[in-house]
Amino acid sequence: MCEEDVAALVVDNGSGMCKAGFAGDDAPRAVFPSIVGRPRHQGVMVGMGQKDSYVGDEAQSKRGILTLKYPIEHGIVTNWDDMEKIWHHTFYNELRVAPEEHPVLLTEAPLNPKANREKMTQIMFETFNTPAMYVAIQAVLSLYASGRTTGIVLDSGDGVSHTVPIYEGYALPHAILRLDLAGRDLTDYLMKVLTERGYSFTTTAEREIVRDIKEKLCYVALDFENEMTTAASSSSLEKSYELPDGQVITIGNERFRCPEAMFQPSFLGMEACGIQETTFNSIMKCDVDIRKDLYANTVLSGGSTMFPGIADRMQKEICALAPSTMKIKIIAPPERKYSVWIGGSILASLSTFQQMWISKQEYDESGPSIVHRKCF
């Protein structure tokens, strides 16, 4: 069996979207929602060939008749049966490959429970019979994708946000901070704010509409109070959005009030620090000698860092917290939505990485716990 001609598969399972493709490619082939939908009603049409579950885009398009569930919450897999369906869909329907013929690189949120990666390992080897696999930390991959080995990554997706300081390619576990505030919470908050305005969004299907509003119209204000004043005195910030039924809604200060919750979690009734303080606290937990390198290499990654204005605001906030002479640079790569996947594609195609894979043989000898020894 010659390993050289077999491309590894890279699967970045996010709480919101699954990104999958082949190592060495510069972008994922498949990007679809991490959703499993089940019919809400018994089928009335005879011979319609109704399935008992739908995955990804198909679930999204039939959302009106389905109950949608996300098997990954806050970066942790909470429903393994549904997770298996998502992986099955990834390999067989999206990538159209046989997983038993390719090594698979999976990703995981930092500070996840140990059982989570053991179960991932077990399913890959026992259900999908992969020849080899590896579990990589998402934020580290984002840093690789930006061409750095030292820096601090603020990775904010749909389910969880982290600040991960990395020095010479190694994450510093004692300084990693986790914030359970991310895209899904912002969507829920926008649902609540719109409900206060008299628009009702309640079902799982309607939540997806609100997510679309958030992605298309929200932005981060450089100065929140100023922006609120502007919004109150003029209609210059108002934008309209057409709902699927043709009704048009107008949103004003909600556009920046929604992402502001990342900087002020008290908006959501959370006691946590905002992303700017979390980043600062994370840097302060590191050795005093490397802080300068972290301030100068602060990399944003993940879908929830895609809001316009977020980099300038981070720059302003971190400058206010850091020592006044410190050089601060916020790096926001345009492809940051997929930078975890891109980093995985880079890593899995490095010749030096090939001895890092966990092989089927090693798994058979040691069991699922091998993952803690081979993957950090």
Swiss-Prot record:
Localization: Cytoplasm, Cytoskeleton
Residue numbers bearing the N-acetylglutamate modification: E3
Recorded catalytic activity of this chain's protein: ATP + H2O = ADP + phosphate + H(+)
Residues annotated with Methionine sulfoxide modification: M45, M48
UniProt-listed Enzyme Commission number(s): 3.6.4.-
Propeptide residues per the UniProt entry: 1-2
Protein name from the UniProt record: Actin-11
Lineage of producing organism: Eukaryota, Metazoa, Ecdysozoa, Arthropoda, Chelicerata
